[in-house]
Amino acid sequence: MNTESAASTADRLRAAVHWLLPTRLLSRLTWHVARSPRPWLKNRLNRFLVRRYGLDLSEAEHSDPTAYPTFYALFTRALRPGARPLPEDPQALISPCDGTVSAVGHLHGERLIQAKGIEYSLRGLLHGLDPAPFRDGAFVTIYLSPRDYHRFHAPVAGRLQAERHVPGRLLTVAPSAVRAIRGLFLRNERHVTLWETVVGLVAVVPVGAVNVGSIETVWGGPVGEAPGLSRDFGPGEGVFLGRGEELGRFNLGSTVVVVLPAGVVRWADGLVAGRPVRMGEVLGRLRRADAR
């Protein structure tokens, strides 16, 4: 099991301050400002974003930050075609997003590791969906900072079997908060998706954060517009996504958790907490569920 280091006193102090912030109000204000098309506002914000966080737009659809119609459009920018060629190995599990690995390893029964010394419940994360297929399975958690590309993609080809929108807090998911706030991913808004794949069910769970009040999926749009959304799909009914196809997007920094069944993935050498990853990068190698 590989996780970030334990919480420091500074981490706990930052978390305590963050608890006092009106995060949902801040997210609503950010939502309106980020979608303003006024050139004087959005161009200043977009240039500030590039300077403040060092955004690399060389792979983006537009390399000029003022070419984006809104601040939100820059944050949720698309990559230009061909910017991220996928690995030729059909058994490669790819990173669903750009970001930094905050935890990777295997479940202890139905328990995942959030950070050093902090576990949380898979049953709680899935919010009513059956955790049994993932018992003693594998997981990886990837944090997206404000500078990262903010769309997330299918780590393996699959058909959507179920989805659940879970309303919740919008606490920061920055590394300091992950180390300090127990059950952080269970407290925050998230959208649980289960995918039927060649290795069995795979869960992909985008987790919201402060300023990230609107998780979107490519098949349903902003999921926050249907709080408590709960849908199950019969054979052949759910959307099918090929490996690397866009699954959704969200604004500002957030987190994606991927959970797999036991025995179906061998993590790549060097995949450890703190390592930067890019969408399309190989995280591990899969083997079919029936080959175990």
UniProtKB/Swiss-Prot annotation:
Needed cofactors: pyruvate
Keyword terms of this UniProt record: Cell membrane, Decarboxylase, Lipid biosynthesis, Lipid metabolism, Lyase, Membrane, Phospholipid biosynthesis, Phospholipid metabolism, Pyruvate, Zymogen
EC numbers for this chain: 4.1.1.65
Catalytic activity: a 1,2-diacyl-sn-glycero-3-phospho-L-serine + H(+) = a 1,2-diacyl-sn-glycero-3-phosphoethanolamine + CO2
Entry keyword Lyase: yes
Positions of post-translational Pyruvic acid (Ser) modification: S254
Keyword Cytoplasm carried by entry: no
One Pfam family named in its UniProt record: PS_Dcarbxylase
Protein topology in the membrane: Peripheral membrane protein
Cofactor, how bound (note): Binds 1 pyruvoyl group covalently per subunit.
Modification after translation, per record: Is synthesized initially as an inactive proenzyme. Formation of the active enzyme involves a self-maturation process in which the active site pyruvoyl group is generated from an internal serine residue via an autocatalytic post-translational modification. Two non-identical subunits are generated from the proenzyme in this reaction, and the pyruvate is formed at the N-terminus of the alpha chain, which is derived from the carboxyl end of the proenzyme.
GO cellular component: plasma membrane
Recorded metabolic or biological pathway in which this protein acts: Phospholipid metabolism; phosphatidylethanolamine biosynthesis; phosphatidylethanolamine from CDP-diacylglycerol: step 2/2
Active site per UniProt: D98 (charge relay system), H153 (charge relay system), S254 (charge relay system), S254 (schiff-base intermediate with substrate)
Transmembrane segments: none
InterPro entries linked to this entry: PS_Dcarbxylase (IPR003817), PSD-B (IPR033177), PSD_type1_pro (IPR033178)
Subcellular location: Cell membrane
Predominant localisation class: membrane
Job description of the protein: Catalyzes the formation of phosphatidylethanolamine (PtdEtn) from phosphatidylserine (PtdSer).
Family: Belongs to the phosphatidylserine decarboxylase family. PSD-B subfamily. Prokaryotic type I sub-subfamily.
SUBUNIT field: Heterodimer of a large membrane-associated beta subunit and a small pyruvoyl-containing alpha subunit.
HAMAP family per record: PS_decarb_PSD_B_type1 (MF_00662)
Protein name in UniProt: Phosphatidylserine decarboxylase proenzyme
Organism: Halorhodospira halophila (strain DSM 244 / SL1)
